[in-house]
Amino acid sequence: MQNNFQLIKNIFINFILILIASVFSIFLLELFVNSFLPQFDPRGMVAYQVNDEGVPLLKYKNQSMRQWKNTGDYDVSVFSNELGLRNHKDIKTNYIDAIYVVGDSYSFGQGVEESERYSDQLEGLIKKPIINISIPTDFQGYDRLINYAIKNGANIEELIIGVCMENDLRVYEDINKGDKKDSFIRESIHFIKTKLTEISALYCFVTSVVHGNRILSKVAKNIGIISKNEAYDLASSSALMNSKKKTLLSSVKYLKIIREKYKIEPIILIVPSRSLWLGNNINQADEIHKTFISMLLTENFLIIDPRESFEKGGTPMDYHFKYDGHWNAKGHQLVSSIIANQIVKNNLKKF
């Protein structure tokens, strides 16, 4: 009995010693990376928050932040104005004939400088002020962003809504339903990874090394530690394949709600899903893409779809970052020219 107690005691003591040594080692490594590899310092990185009214915004206001991807895709500056939006313009200013842009991370300009976004390049092409109020979110978030901008003095008469075909389409009536256990696990993992990215230089360094090494990256993807960003599989990450009709109807309905609520005839900019060109659901993605646009046209929405231009050269993924998947500067430049040409071609004087 005495021997068993002593054995348990020794195991416990050894465990505590190993734990203390591990924590101390991690602490030293964190200090080392912070001191000698400042490019991995997470301080000042882009962060988001939802305000008391449910509006998604940049967390820090009136300052520039850094948006960095551990895959090496980008390292850019993001300025947040006094309202928590990525725009140097003051929306309270009475800009004549201003066009507002709302959308998710593509329209926000993830991975590119503010001046490289399609909205900012469009301003130079059509010689009209463009005010971008985009934040990574969905139709519900776009609705709240438009309302937030109006409450803060914006006069929105002309609007472009960037619709991301990868994650904007959903059954909005069921947005708070679903598998709570599965959702909790996914959200918990995402929360932990996000927090580590925000506070740990060591985590940023390690993930960068993993992404940069072909073997380590493959192992990490196979066990699910990192996402397979370069081959986005629409069917595996949404319920679209199982409830396509319901999802598309609900998505079109929400866009109609926005149009009627704010008395605006928006241009709908389609952000094509990468599943059109990658993964195992190319045919399904093609069907969804065409069906959704057809439904929008039936409801008399103005549509701009850059898909054909992306595919024209045969290498549509050249307009996206290699790993992150968002549009790169080349993609934004192409989209800005497409929008400008469509505005001129269709004689959209309002725009």
For each feature predicted by the language model, list its residue ranges:
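N-terminal Lys/Arg-rich, disordered targeting/topogenic segments
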Residues: 1-10
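Hydrophobic membrane-insertion alpha-helices, especially the h-region
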Residues: 14-32
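Generic structural signal for small/hydrophobic residues in well-ordered secondary structure
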Residues: 30, 104, 159, 259, ...
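Membrane/wall-proximal cationic-aromatic binding patches
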Residues: 37-131, 144, 232-235, 310-314, ...
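Conserved SGNH/GDSL esterase-like catalytic core that processes O-acyl groups on lipids
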Residues: 108-184, 190
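Short, amphipathic alpha-helical "lid/cap" segments that border enzyme active or binding sites
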Residues: 139, 143, 245, 249, ...
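Serine-dependent acyl-ester chemistry module
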Residues: 166-293, 306-312, 316
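Catalytic His-Asp segment of secreted/periplasmic serine-dependent ester chemistry enzymes
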Residues: 275-278, 283-351
